[in-house]
């Protein structure tokens, strides 16, 4: 028995794990919860829900220029903030991609209209939208947050983006292999 159920009417397939697989899944969740404890050397930003009120300009950029679903601004808890960015040494208005794990804000990526970027100094690098792949049989891994949002716009929920863009160093993935993949 493979644990696969099949509906001959609609073609829907469903996998039902056996007891040992269920125990393994529970163990992975427990390991995941233990791993979520903040190591002493990491900083965490504080999420301010007041910043989820976005400017009309940012909303137009998101929906009209990027052609992304309006609902994702709230679903992904996108915020907007004026931040001093190192590339320009000036304060710039930024779209903020907030990196959550288990409902806790872990990091924030600030992106200005001039394509200047910054992440919270000393914060842990984790994949963007990591909780979306918890207990899913497959996922899509993209290079950037906008790419992930594009997949979500067309209906995929199991999408993450690598931290800090495309690179050959995949060490960030090690912590999530047992708990998320």
Give short role names for the model-derived ranges.
Residues 6:
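The −1 position to Zn-ligating cysteines in a subset of zinc-ribbon hairpins
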Residues 10:
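Short Cys/His-rich metal-coordination motifs, predominantly Zn2+-binding knuckles/fingers
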Residues 3:
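Short metal-coordination and nucleic-acid-contact micro-motifs, chiefly zinc-binding Cys/His arrays
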Residues 14:
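Cys/His-rich microdomains that often coordinate metals
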Residues 85-181:
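Phosphate-handling DNA/RNA-contact segment within nucleic-acid enzymes
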Residues 18-102, 124-135:
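TOPRIM metal-binding catalytic domain and adjacent DNA-binding surface shared by DnaG-type primases
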């Amino acid at each position: 028995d493979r644990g696969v159920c099949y509906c001959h009417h609609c073609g829907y397939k469903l996998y039902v794990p056996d007891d040992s697989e269920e125990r393994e899944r529970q163990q992975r969740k427990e390991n995941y919860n233990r791993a979520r404890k903040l190591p002493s050397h990491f900083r965490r930003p504080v999420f301010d829900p007041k910043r989820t009120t976005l400017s009309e300009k940012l909303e137009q950029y998101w929906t009209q220029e990027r052609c992304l679903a309006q609902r994702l601004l709230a679903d992904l808890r996108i915020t907007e903030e004026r931040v001093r960015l190192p590339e320009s040494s000036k304060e710039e208005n930024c779209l903020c991609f907030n990196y959550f794990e288990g409902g806790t804000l872990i990091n924030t990526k600030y992106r200005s209209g001039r394509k200047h970027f910054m992440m919270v100094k000393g914060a842990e690098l984790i994949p963007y939208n990591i909780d979306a792949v918890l207990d899913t049989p497959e996922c899509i891994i993209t290079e950037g947050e906008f790419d992930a949002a594009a997949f979500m716009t067309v209906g995929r929920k199991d999408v993450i983006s690598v931290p800090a863009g495309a690179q050959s160093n995949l060490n960030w993935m090690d912590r999530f292999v047992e708990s998320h993949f």
